[in-house]
Amino acid sequence: MDRLHTSSADWPDHLATQVVRVRGGVLQAAGQSDHVAEETPVALEFNGISHATMLVTPTHLDDFALGFALTEGIVGGMADVRGVELETRCDGIVVQVEIATSCEVRLKERRRAMAGRTGCGLCGVETLPEVVRDVAPVADSDALPVHNVLRAMQSLRSRQTLHDATGATHAAGWADASGEVVLAREDVGRHNALDKLIGALARQGIAPLPGMAVVSSRASFEMVQKTASAGIPILAAVSAPTALAIRLARQTNVTLLGFVRNTDATIYSHPQRIAA
């Protein structure tokens, strides 16, 4: 990637606002403050073509754009990305991504022109095949001890600094085979957080094997779709998966775990990757 200009110093991830609290059913004195997460319209442009507008926490937007391009099948890898630039316009941010001209056919196939809701991955998709598109199965990988998966979820919690400040964000983390989260991203949208993580993995050249993705949310089918698109073998979620997510995980050779909390978890697909 030849050009990367992604300073986000002008875009805070949260701010303080005046509130009136109720405690024990009693109104408290005015003049108190609380920290709330920022939510900013972010437009993605590929080779000058407007593709999507999402509501995103305005941090790690380079990772977000790269992860989105990868998981949407717009680019096949970092070799297809020529540069990323950020620009403030009106009331939002434009992320301009320059990609190889050979990717423009795929771009047109996946093009979305919409104003998305928070973390909404389906806004603007017109037909069902566009939603449940073909994703290549993930490569087989060695089993990891279940203790390491549980450790990874606990490790993710310690990386949720924005959530600690605001209580409003999801996190997606990448844990190595030992269960240590070595990379994490947060966002108001769970899909956005996972895109940021996948983009960061690609940008930093971190291989998806061995290891796992852990998320502080439920596991929707699109979370599984993004995980499989990135070649990640295991997705562990703190909450429940959907039926479609389970079917897609089984089809794409992704080991899907839900309700990963403390010493418990439920394995919904490909349990051979989880060892005692």
Swiss-Prot record:
<dbReference type="GO" id="GO:0005737">
    <property type="term" value="C:cytoplasm"/>
</dbReference>
<comment type="function">
    <text>Required for formate dehydrogenase (FDH) activity. Acts as a sulfur carrier protein that transfers sulfur from IscS to the molybdenum cofactor prior to its insertion into FDH.</text>
</comment>
<dbReference type="InterPro" id="IPR016193">
    <property type="entry name" value="Cytidine_deaminase-like"/>
</dbReference>
<dbReference type="InterPro" id="IPR003786">
    <property type="entry name" value="FdhD"/>
</dbReference>
<keyword id="KW-0963">Cytoplasm</keyword>
<dbReference type="GO" id="GO:0097163">
    <property type="term" value="F:sulfur carrier activity"/>
</dbReference>
<dbReference type="GO" id="GO:0016783">
    <property type="term" value="F:sulfurtransferase activity"/>
</dbReference>
<keyword id="KW-0501">Molybdenum cofactor biosynthesis</keyword>
<protein>
    <recommendedName>
        <fullName>Sulfur carrier protein FdhD</fullName>
    </recommendedName>
</protein>
<dbReference type="GO" id="GO:0006777">
    <property type="term" value="P:Mo-molybdopterin cofactor biosynthetic process"/>
</dbReference>
<feature type="active site" description="Cysteine persulfide intermediate">
    <location>
        <position position="120"/>
    </location>
</feature>
<dbReference type="Pfam" id="PF02634">
    <property type="entry name" value="FdhD-NarQ"/>
</dbReference>
<comment type="similarity">
    <text>Belongs to the FdhD family.</text>
</comment>
